[in-house]
Amino acid sequence: SCAGAFLDTTLSTIGSVIFDYGCGRGDDVSLLKKSGYKNVFGWDPHFFPDSKKLSKADFVTLSFVLNVIEDKDERSKTLLEAYSISSKALIFSVMLDSQNTLQYAIPYNDGYISSISTFQKYYSPAEIEEYIYALLKIHPLKLANGVYIIFKDEFLQQDYLFKKQIGLLAQTVKQDTSFENDFYSTELVSQFADLILS
């Protein structure tokens, strides 16, 4: 989910305003609130149509929303609106295509009618990245399988990428057997990574 991937990034503070655009039944909103975030809001046209649709938030999540919008123009409009609401980043997830999923689906427009009679647009990783670039002229960064982030805050993006590289370096050093007998080097890199990532 977007919320799980978002929590893994450690991008925000407890005071960050997070808006779940198309929140469904509110599972991600609940998860973020249980994780200590105070300013989490959700809106969904079907389940929470009367909730306030925020006009500005630090972070906006868009979990599996693009998959269920049948009209291509409405799909693009939704993505653009969610992106415009975010001041720091938009985190979104999409269903990726797989043979298991598609074997029971009926082709319809640019997507499928699922086995439970709902519209689904499945994407390949290359297709969703091209779609985002065509609309926003920005390359999304992959957080997890089918989950991406589009930064609006360049400093935050650089901070995220730096911490990600430090984390990868720390994992490499911890796994590298040539450091087995060099406790000092391994411990030093590990402490440095912990300091940077905290």
Model-derived features: positions:
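A short SAM/SAH-binding and catalytic strip from SAM-dependent methyltransferases
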Residues: 59-73
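Class I (Rossmann-like) S-adenosyl-L-methionine-dependent methyltransferase catalytic domain
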Residues: 1-55, 91-197
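A short glycine-rich, Lys/Arg-flanked "PGG" loop and its adjoining helix->strand segment in the class I
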Residues: 76-90
